[in-house]
């Protein structure tokens, strides 16, 4: 169906899950994959596989509210034939071959609040970044809506700011082939 002359193209549909409980790892996975593939139950099953004989599973919250660790994210991606590659913060971001990367998952310090009261504490929070129709988006589940970052320069600026704050870890979500060839890293 063609558009009327002068009509604005409709914005792309960007899948974005909002924060529930401590399920930011589940939300980050689904947001980076742009569809609901994982649930709390699926993440809990991965935890059981990672530590089958453990009474207190080290890969999630003791309260059963989520708060999954990086091993759950990596195992979830591996189950889909994908890989998570740690980005070495000492490398310049110009070496990141973004066209080879499906998306990014960041682990950031996040402020803690009780209602309107901000506490002087910080917890870890998983955030997804993904390109949709040529535009990179911040798909943080704590945001009301996806935040457009723009092109490759925009996402590099966002990453540089996050890494400059310290305590930020970056995972590149790539295909197995990209992981094996190391083509997520520019050689020029």
UniProtKB/Swiss-Prot annotation:
Residues 11-188 form the Josephin domain. One of its GO terms (biological process) is proteolysis. The active site is at 24 (nucleophile), 125 (proton acceptor). GO terms for cellular component: cytosol. This is Josephin-2. GO terms for molecular function: cysteine-type deubiquitinase activity. The keyword Hydrolase applies. It catalyses: Thiol-dependent hydrolysis of ester, thioester, amide, peptide and isopeptide bonds formed by the C-terminal Gly of ubiquitin (a 76-residue protein attached to proteins as an intracellular targeting signal). Pfam families: Josephin (PF02099). It is an enzyme of class 3 (hydrolase). It is found in: Cytoplasm, Cytosol. Cleaves 'Lys-63'-linked poly-ubiquitin chains, and with lesser efficiency 'Lys-48'-linked poly-ubiquitin chains (in vitro). May act as a deubiquitinating enzyme. The keyword Nucleotide-binding does not apply. Its main location: cytoplasm. Its EC number is 3.4.19.12. Keywords: Cytoplasm, Hydrolase, Protease, Ubl conjugation pathway. PROSITE patterns: JOSEPHIN (PS50957).
């Amino acid at each position: 169906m063609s558009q009327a002359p002068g009509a604005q193209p409709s914005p792309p549909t960007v899948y974005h899950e909002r924060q529930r409980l401590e399920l930011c790892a589940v939300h980050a996975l689904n947001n980076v994959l742009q569809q609901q593939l994982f649930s709390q139950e699926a993440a809990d099953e991965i935890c059981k596989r990672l530590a089958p004989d453990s009474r207190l599973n080290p890969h999630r919250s003791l309260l059963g509210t989520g708060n999954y660790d990086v091993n759950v994210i990596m195992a979830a991606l591996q189950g889909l034939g994908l890989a998570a590659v740690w980005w070495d913060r000492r490398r310049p971001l110009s070496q990141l071959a973004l066209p080879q990367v499906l998306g990014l998952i960041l682990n950031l310090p996040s402020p803690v609040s009780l209602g309107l009261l901000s506490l002087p504490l910080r917890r870890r929070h998983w955030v997804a970044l993904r390109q949709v129709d040529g535009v990179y988006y911040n798909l943080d589940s704590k945001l009301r809506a996806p935040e457009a970052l723009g092109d490759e320069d925009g996402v590099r600026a966002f990453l540089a700011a996050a890494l400059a704050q310290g305590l930020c870890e970056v995972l590149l979500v790539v295909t197995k082939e990209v992981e094996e060839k190391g083509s997520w890293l520019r050689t020029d």
